[in-house]
């Protein structure tokens, strides 16, 4: 198993395995393969040390991944909360941030449904 950016990558095609790293999407993985001239259809275990080193070097130089990216995202959210803007308030309350409806749906952000007793007539 190859280890890049602190993540054990499975023995799948290179472009698929690279997406297991937080911050690398399918298109980014293809760009990395293109930049390092590695065949994206090659399995991870078939790569030699020079190819792995080239991939590591491109990722370190051009991409924010794993811990650095998670920290940056968390700091961005904290900044929004500290300045008290609308988006920060929505993050603080655990509600959808990007204008979605909340009268129905929004269960992912709001959590499990809390049933309230209905009004008696």
Swiss-Prot record:
<dbReference type="GO" id="GO:0015935">
    <property type="term" value="C:small ribosomal subunit"/>
</dbReference>
<keyword id="KW-0694">RNA-binding</keyword>
<dbReference type="GO" id="GO:0019843">
    <property type="term" value="F:rRNA binding"/>
</dbReference>
<protein>
    <recommendedName>
        <fullName>Small ribosomal subunit protein uS13</fullName>
    </recommendedName>
</protein>
<dbReference type="InterPro" id="IPR027437">
    <property type="entry name" value="Rbsml_uS13_C"/>
</dbReference>
<dbReference type="InterPro" id="IPR010979">
    <property type="entry name" value="Ribosomal_uS13-like_H2TH"/>
</dbReference>
<comment type="similarity">
    <text>Belongs to the universal ribosomal protein uS13 family.</text>
</comment>
<keyword id="KW-0699">rRNA-binding</keyword>
<dbReference type="GO" id="GO:0000049">
    <property type="term" value="F:tRNA binding"/>
</dbReference>
<keyword id="KW-0687">Ribonucleoprotein</keyword>
<comment type="subunit">
    <text>Part of the 30S ribosomal subunit. Forms a loose heterodimer with protein S19. Forms two bridges to the 50S subunit in the 70S ribosome.</text>
</comment>
<comment type="function">
    <text>Located at the top of the head of the 30S subunit, it contacts several helices of the 16S rRNA. In the 70S ribosome it contacts the 23S rRNA (bridge B1a) and protein L5 of the 50S subunit (bridge B1b), connecting the 2 subunits; these bridges are implicated in subunit movement. Contacts the tRNAs in the A and P-sites.</text>
</comment>
<dbReference type="InterPro" id="IPR019980">
    <property type="entry name" value="Ribosomal_uS13_bac-type"/>
</dbReference>
<dbReference type="GO" id="GO:0006412">
    <property type="term" value="P:translation"/>
</dbReference>
<dbReference type="GO" id="GO:0005829">
    <property type="term" value="C:cytosol"/>
</dbReference>
<dbReference type="GO" id="GO:0003735">
    <property type="term" value="F:structural constituent of ribosome"/>
</dbReference>
<dbReference type="InterPro" id="IPR001892">
    <property type="entry name" value="Ribosomal_uS13"/>
</dbReference>
<feature type="region of interest" description="Disordered">
    <location>
        <begin position="91"/>
        <end position="121"/>
    </location>
</feature>
<keyword id="KW-0820">tRNA-binding</keyword>
<dbReference type="InterPro" id="IPR018269">
    <property type="entry name" value="Ribosomal_uS13_CS"/>
</dbReference>
<dbReference type="Pfam" id="PF00416">
    <property type="entry name" value="Ribosomal_S13"/>
</dbReference>
<keyword id="KW-0689">Ribosomal protein</keyword>
């Amino acid at each position: 198993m190859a280890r890049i950016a602190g993540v054990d990558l499975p023995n799948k095609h290179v472009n698929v395995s690279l997406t297991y790293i937080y911050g690398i999407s399918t298109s980014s993985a293809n760009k990395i393969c293109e930049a390092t001239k590695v065949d994206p259809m090659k399995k991870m275990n078939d790569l030699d040390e020079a190819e792995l080193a080239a991939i590591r070097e491109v990722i370190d130089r051009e991409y924010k991944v794993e811990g650095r990216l998670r920290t940056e995202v968390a700091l961005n959210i904290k900044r929004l909360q500290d300045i008290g803007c609308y988006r920060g308030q929505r993050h603080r309350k655990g509600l959808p941030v990007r204008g979605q409806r909340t009268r129905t749906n929004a269960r992912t952000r709001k959590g499990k449904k809390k049933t309230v007793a209905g009004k008696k007539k």
